[in-house]
């Protein structure tokens, strides 16, 4: 019986060392060697080298001179510690009322936008932290951004087109635009908005309220 116990103990210790120490160290080492940026959280820095967020976690931009992301049901909105969807079903009256309110707000804030309001801008993602928009949804907001920044619409559209990411490996997903990276590109191209600049809701330059 004692030999059986020793065998079990040795097996337990070896397994703990392999799976709890050596394997995590090997994976961490390879990740740091091959793709250190992604392994460390895909941090995004501004022009002064300050970390302003992660490329993987959306932020709730609301100022008129920035592109806005999808609505978020994560905490008070884009709370990285409270990732979740709304859990409202297609027959939910609350969902219908919220979508109607979003539609009204978006039409009011984007009077020069061409075409109907994109569905993305009135629906939350499953995680509540989606950092991307479709290129079409970003372009729909371009007129508001151009007006708020006092630049030509074509110049803002050029920034959007330059930030479009293609399908992963050429086949997975759809073309998309990272909202945080897009707004940082706006600041690099046209300069950051002054802190006192009027906003739609009054918040959020890149990094303000960053996760």
UniProtKB/Swiss-Prot annotation:
Highest taxon listed in the record's lineage: Bacteria
Subcellular location: Cell membrane
Transmembrane regions: 13-35
Membrane-protein topology: Single-pass membrane protein
Function in brief: Part of the high-affinity ATP-driven potassium transport (or Kdp) system, which catalyzes the hydrolysis of ATP coupled with the electrogenic transport of potassium into the cytoplasm. This subunit acts as a catalytic chaperone that increases the ATP-binding affinity of the ATP-hydrolyzing subunit KdpB by the formation of a transient KdpB/KdpC/ATP ternary complex.
Any one GO molecular function term: ATP binding
GO cellular component: plasma membrane
Subunit structure and binding partners: The system is composed of three essential subunits: KdpA, KdpB and KdpC.
Protein name as it appears in the record: Potassium-transporting ATPase KdpC subunit
Alphabetically ordered keywords of this record: ATP-binding, Cell membrane, Ion transport, Membrane, Nucleotide-binding, Potassium, Potassium transport, Transmembrane, Transmembrane helix, Transport
């Amino acid at each position: 019986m004692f030999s059986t116990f020793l065998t079990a103990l040795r097996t337990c210790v070896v397994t703990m060392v392999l799976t709890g120490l050596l394997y995590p160290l090997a994976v961490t080492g390879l990740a740091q060697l091959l793709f250190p940026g992604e392994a460390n959280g895909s941090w995004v820095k501004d022009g002064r080298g300050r970390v302003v967020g992660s490329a993987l976690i959306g932020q709730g931009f609301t100022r008129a001179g920035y592109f806005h992301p999808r609505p978020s049901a994560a905490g008070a909105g884009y709370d990285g510690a409270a990732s979740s969807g709304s859990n409202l079903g297609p027959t939910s009256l609350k969902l219908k009322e919220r979508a109607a309110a979003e539609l009204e707000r978006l039409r009011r804030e984007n009077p020069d936008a061409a075409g109907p309001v994109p569905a993305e801008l009135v629906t939350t993602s499953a995680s509540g932290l989606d950092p991307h928009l479709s290129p079409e949804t970003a372009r729909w907001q371009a007129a508001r951004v151009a007006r708020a920044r006092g630049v030509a619409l074509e110049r803002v559209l050029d920034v959007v087109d330059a930030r479009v990411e293609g399908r992963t490996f050429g086949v997975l997903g759809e073309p998309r635009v990272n909202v945080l990276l897009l707004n940082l590109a706006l600041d690099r191209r046209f300069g950051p908005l002054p802190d006192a600049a009027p906003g739609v809701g009054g918040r959020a330059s890149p990094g303000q309220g960053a996760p």
